[in-house]
């Protein structure tokens, strides 16, 4: 079997309906577009969200909030993912990147508390949740927030 020999099973793909090919086809004359009107014309139809001239919903609702340009973009990592490291390891953002847990460090790494940790690790990161710190310290490790 070669790629050029592959074909769909007979009857699995319906034939393309050709419109505008005479009244016997069932889709002749107006080609399923009805009579006249904006939607019957070529390029016709209204844009997404258009409500016939009524003020659209997206413009009726108020704007809210803003984007804080100073927000730190921290990459979240769960405690359970640190289980792959050997005991007594010093876990840093660079080590997490080398291990493939973090693709791009951005403004740093934040350790979150999901999962279990049994190994004693020293974790040096930009931020950690209270639950994550408790789990790391319960396993005998320590957290240093840089």
Swiss-Prot record:
PROSITE patterns: RIBOSOMAL_L15. GO terms for biological process: translation. The keyword DNA repair does not apply. GO terms for cellular component: cytosolic large ribosomal subunit. InterPro entries: Ribosomal_uL15 (IPR030878), Ribosomal_uL15/eL18 (IPR021131), Ribosomal_uL15/eL18_sf (IPR036227), Ribosomal_uL15_bac-type (IPR005749), Ribosomal_uL15_CS (IPR001196). It comes from the Bacteria. Residues 21-31 have a biased composition (Gly residues). GO terms for molecular function: rRNA binding; structural constituent of ribosome. The keyword DNA-binding does not apply. Binds to the 23S rRNA. Part of the 50S ribosomal subunit. HAMAP family: Ribosomal_uL15. PANTHER family: 50S RIBOSOMAL PROTEIN L15, LARGE RIBOSOMAL SUBUNIT PROTEIN UL15M. This is Large ribosomal subunit protein uL15. The gene is rplO.
């Amino acid at each position: 079997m070669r790629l050029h020999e592959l074909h769909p099973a007979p009857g699995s793909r319906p034939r393309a309906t050709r419109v505008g090919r005479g009244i016997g086809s069932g889709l002749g004359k107006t080609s399923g577009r009805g009579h006249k009107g904006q939607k019957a014309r070529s390029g016709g139809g209204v844009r997404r969200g258009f409500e016939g001239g009524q003020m659209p919903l997206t413009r009726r609702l108020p704007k809210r909030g803003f984007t804080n340009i100073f927000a730190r973009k921290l990459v979240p990592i769960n405690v359970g993912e640190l289980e792959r490291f050997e005991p007594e390891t010093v876990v840093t953002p660079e080590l997490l990147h080398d291990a493939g847990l973090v693709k791009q460090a951005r403004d740093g790494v934040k350790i979150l508390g999901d999962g279990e940790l049994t190994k004693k690790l020293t974790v040096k990161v930009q931020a950690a949740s209270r639950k994550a710190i408790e789990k790391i310290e319960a396993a005998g490790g320590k957290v240093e927030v840089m």
